[in-house]
Each structure stands twice: as C-alpha cells, then as structure tokens.
UniProtKB/Swiss-Prot annotation:
This is tRNA dimethylallyltransferase. It catalyses: adenosine(37) in tRNA + dimethylallyl diphosphate = N(6)-dimethylallyladenosine(37) in tRNA + diphosphate. It comes from the Bacteria. The keyword Ion transport does not apply. Pfam families: IPPT. One of its GO terms (biological process) is tRNA modification. InterPro entries: Dimethylallyltransferase, IPT, P-loop_NTPase. Keywords: ATP-binding, Magnesium, Nucleotide-binding, Transferase, tRNA processing. It comes from Geobacillus thermodenitrificans (strain NG80-2). The keyword ATP-binding applies.
C-alpha cells in the first residue's frame, strides 16, 4: 500500500514550522526536516532550527545529524527521508516533511534516480580550481550563461551545487533544470503538497525582524564558535546567516553591514524559494499573511489534507 505523506513548503519565515507542529498534533504526525542546513549540529539560531521546548511533544527527524564540515548530499537525504517515511508509516503515524530546500524534498518524494546522473570527475576538479582562483561568483556567472533557471535558484555560495549543474550541462548538453525535469517521473507517495505564502511586504518585514531576533538570541556568538574552530572550507558555513558574519570576522565589512547583507540575502532567498516551488511542484497554496488567522488556516489546511488523503483527526 502506498504511504500517505504531507509536505509543507514555502519561503523562510512564512510559518512552516509552526504549522507543521499544529498539523502533526491533529493528524498523529511526525516531522521530517526538509532543510539542508538544519542537519548540522551547532547551527541552531542561524538555521531557525525548532527548539526542543517548541516541539510540543511532536517527534522531529533529521535535525543535528552531522557535524558542520561532514559531507552530506541530496542522495543521502533521499535515502534517510525515504527510510523515515517507511518507518513512521509502519508505526501508524503520518510523515510530515517540513522545509524550504526544494531539491531535497523533491528528491525524497519523487522517483528521482541519481544513479542516472552523468558525471565527469576531471571537469569537476577544474571547476573547483576555478572557484578557488576566481571565486564562487565567477562560477555562478558561468551557470547563469548556460542555465539561467538553475542559476536563479542556486545560491552563488553553494559551490557544490553550482558545479553539479555545470557538470550535467557539460556531460549532456542540456541545462541542469531541463535534466531535472526529465528525472521527475512520478510521486512515490500519496501526497498532500502544501505551500505557504504571504504578501511580500509582510514576509520581508518578518524576515528583517527575525534577523534582529537572531542577533539578540546569540547568532554572532554561534557563528563565532564555528569561526574560531577554523571551519571555513565547507558548505555549511557558506549558508545565509553564517557567510555574512564570517565576512565581518574577517574584517571585510562592519557588523552593521553584515547584518544588512544578511537581511538582504534572506529576502532574496525567500523570493527564489517561492519561484522554485511555484515552477517545480504541484503545490496547493495557502496565504499566511495574517497571523491572527493562524487557527483558521490550520483548520482550512487540515480539511484539505483530510480530503486529499482521506484522513481523520488524531489518526
């Protein structure tokens, strides 16, 4: 029997975490994090990782499973997430994937076969050398020239994914975005795909306010601890919220400039997330602009899920 799952996606600061917990309590669910950065230990504030006292008794999976410089890929996420879906379902619970890393979520729930992916190790080495000599931005410009769609959704600092996209283009002559669409065959599960959105001005205000809260909660100290451990050449510390403060610690920018850059990068990331989910997945969208209507929205989304998956509350 095909497992039933709920997937909640959307931009940063739209309210995915809070909604996921509310729905998990109503539906007897367990949450699988669909965030590529929340897997890392010691990166809590900058990734907006849910705190233990905020989980309200709902089990959460794929948090704090790797050290910051331990390698982790979409292939490993796919394997772990699918195993969790099987395990949670077998225990009579409902798997709920919550996150904003589109490729990871897509790889977990679709018939995505990475063994089919073309590769060229020598070309990868050459691109890594180029990034080391000319910087991540130069590599990203190359991707923009051949595959603007992928360039729009892959952050310039995510060198590993930029290289992967260029490698696929090099090997196939097709943009990575086009190759990915060919890989996305069908959903593996009976899925309710929920997308959360909000008015842009409201979302951007929330993002700016959240950055200020992160600073107050100790983000500078969190990033400083990674910096002082000498963690530099790994993907985790290139994440938004970490890279900007590394620039501050390196003396490249003032603290105020780093914080403003963090806000700007977060807003841009939210825009890219929305664009990606609208173009890549058949999502049912719900507007979360008004926080006063949260309880109403929970009921509305619950009814949609119950109808889509033929569920009852507290399964």
């Amino acid at each position: 029997m095909t497992e039933k799952i709920v997937v909640i996606v959307g931009p940063t600061e739209v309210g995915k975490t809070k909604l996921g917990i509310a729905l998990a309590k109503k539906l007897g669910g367990e949450i699988i994090s669909g965030d590529s950065m929340q897997i890392y230990k010691g990166m809590d504030i900058g990734t907006a990782k849910v705190k233990p006292d905020e989980m309200e008794g709902v089990p959460h999976h794929l948090l704090d499973i790797k050290e910051p410089c331990e390698p982790f890929s979409v292939v490993e996420f796919q394997r772990l997430a699918r195993a969790l879906i099987t395990d949670i379902s077998a225990r009579g619970r409902l798997p709920i994937i919550v996150g904003g890393t589109g490729l990871y979520i897509q790889a977990a729930i679709y018939d995505y076969r990475f063994s089919d992916a073309p590769s060229d190790e020598a070309y990868r080495r050459a691109l890594r050398q180029l990034a080391a000599e000319q910087g991540a931005e130069a590599l990203h410009e190359q991707l923009k020239a051949v595959d603007p769609e992928s360039a729009a959704r892959i952050h310039p600092n995510n060198v590993r994914r930029v290289i992967r996209a260029l490698e696929v283009y090099h090997c196939t002559g097709k943009p990575f975005s086009e190759w990915q669409r060919g890989q996305q065959r069908q959903l593996l599960y009976e899925t309710a795909l929920i997308g959360l959105t909000a008015e842009r001005s409201v979302l951007y205000r929330r993002i700016n306010e959240r950055v200020d809260e992160m600073i107050a909660e100790g983000l500078i100290e969190e990033v400083r601890s990674l910096y002082d451990r000498g963690l530099r050449d790994c993907q985790a510390v290139q994440a938004i919220g970490y890279k900007e403060l590394y620039d501050y610690f390196d003396g490249r920018v003032s603290l105020d400039e780093a914080i403003e850059q963090l806000k700007q990068n977060s807003r841009r990331y939210a825009k890219r997330q929305l664009t990606w989910f609208r173009n890549q997945m058949p999502v049912e969208w719900f507007d979360m602009t008004d926080p006063e209507k949260f309880a109403v929205k929970v009921e509305e989304i619950f009814r949609y899920i119950a109808g889509k998956l033929r569920l009852e509350a507290n399964i």
